[in-house]
C-alpha cells in the first residue's frame, strides 16, 4: 500500500461534489463527536470559518452516523481523528470521498498510515 503522507505539491481531499486543495496552514475545527444528528454543529463550524471539519470517531458505529445522517451537510474538507483502528476504518469506509486523517491520533504512525492508505486518505 502506498501511504499518502503530506505531499506539498498536490494535497487534496474531496467529497461527493467538491475537490478541496489543501494548505499546510489550514486550521481544523475543534474535534466534534460523531452522532446521529451533527447538522447544527457542522453548520456552526462552517459559520465560524474553520478550514476543515474535524470529526472524532470513537466506535465503528460512528462511521454509520457519518454516512447516513451527516456527510451531505459538510461543505468543508473532513478530517477524522481516532485512537481506535476499527473506528477510523469504519469512518473512512463510510465517507464518500477522499478524507484527511489527523496525525495527532494516538495510533502508531505506521498503523495510521496503513489505514489511511487503504482508503486513499491523506495523513496531515
Question: What positions do the PLM features span?
Answer:
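Domain-level signal for soluble alpha/beta catalytic cores
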Residues: 1-124
Amino acid at each position: 500500500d502506498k501511504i499518502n503522507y503530506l505531499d506539498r505539491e498536490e494535497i487534496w481531499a474531496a467529497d461527493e461534489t467538491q475537490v478541496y486543495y489543501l494548505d499546510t496552514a489550514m486550521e481544523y475545527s475543534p474535534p466534534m463527536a460523531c452522532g446521529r444528528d451533527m447538522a447544527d454543529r457542522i453548520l456552526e463550524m462552517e459559520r465560524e470559518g474553520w478550514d476543515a471539519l474535524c470529526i472524532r470517531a470513537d466506535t465503528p458505529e460512528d462511521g454509520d452516523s457519518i454516512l447516513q445522517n451527516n456527510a451531505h451537510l459538510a461543505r468543508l474538507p473532513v478530517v477524522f481523528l481516532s485512537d481506535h483502528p476499527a473506528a477510523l476504518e469504519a469512518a473512512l469506509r463510510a465517507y464518500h470521498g477522499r478524507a484527511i486523517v489527523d496525525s495527532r491520533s494516538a495510533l502508531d504512525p505506521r498503523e495510521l498510515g496503513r489505514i489511511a492508505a487503504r482508503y486513499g486518505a491523506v495523513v496531515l
